[in-house]
Amino acid sequence: MIITVINGSPRKNGATSKVLTYLYKDIERLIPDVKINYFDLSEVNPSYCIGCLNCYKMGKCINQNDKVEYIHDIITKSDGVIFGSPTYGSSVTGLFKVFTDRAHMMLERLLYRKPCIAVTTYENARGSKAISFIKSMVLDSGGYVCGSLSIKTGFNQNPITEKVESKIQKVSKKFIYCIEEKKNPPVLSQIYNFIAINAVLKPMAFKDIEQYKGIIDRWEEQGII
């Protein structure tokens, strides 16, 4: 079992990191031979997407100067993915958004049928906005959220309370179950993706096969077409 964890916080040892670390260590406790790939985006420091659409044509980002394309390929091989971000300005961090732009996840359906966990931390309010962004990103990338954690905590405080531990343990068990049992995505998620692929994405891509060759090749690899 291969799990990839993405920490979208600029603070490497902040509250979001603590929640993600507890979560993946609990998964390791339950599945000792699991392989965890953990990435701090603050270390990756991804460059902005420049909108060149090379990923549509060639199936990879033209910018090879950071680890974003490497992480993209690791996610492709993963059985499940955990995404985390603190709440900044009523949403995810700019760092997290830059990564999702660069990783060309959505059109190619990078998370196709993969179970995911959405994690956010917040101090006062709007944690629901950040978690909503992550959930939408997962759905729009072909995956589904089988568990989420929205943790209220103060600045520089340890978010891991007894109550939070219990929540994390429940989410990790469900996540493992979804992976091991190869659970189908929820029906509404399947319907959404069916419509997105067949009514929107395929007509667009096959109208200009040369421009979207990289996307079409990825769909074939995933068994989407």
Curated annotation (Swiss-Prot):
| GO molecular function terms listed in the Swiss-Prot or TrEMBL record | 4 iron, 4 sulfur cluster binding; metal ion binding; oxidoreductase activity
Cofactor(s) named in the record: FMN; [4Fe-4S] cluster
Per the UniProt record, one Pfam family is: FMN_red
Q: Which InterPro entries match?
A: Flavoprotein-like_sf, FMN_Rdtase-like_dom, ISF_SsuE-like
Task: Work out whether the entry's keyword set contains Iron-sulfur.
Answer: yes
Question: Where along the chain is [4Fe-4S] cluster bound?
Answer: C49, C52, C55, C61
On cofactor binding, the record's note says: Binds 1 FMN per subunit. Binds 1 [4Fe-4S] cluster per subunit.
Which keywords does this chain's UniProt record carry? 4Fe-4S, Flavoprotein, FMN, Iron, Iron-sulfur, Metal-binding
Tell me the domain of life: Bacteria
List the PANTHER family: NAD(P)H-DEPENDENT FMN-CONTAINING OXIDOREDUCTASE YWQN-RELATED
**What role does it play?**
Redox-active protein probably involved in electron transport.
Subunit structure of this chain's protein: Homodimer.
Return the similarity comment: Belongs to the SsuE family. Isf subfamily.
Q: What is this protein called?
A: Iron-sulfur flavoprotein CD630_04720
Species in which this protein is naturally found: Clostridioides difficile (strain 630) (Peptoclostridium difficile)
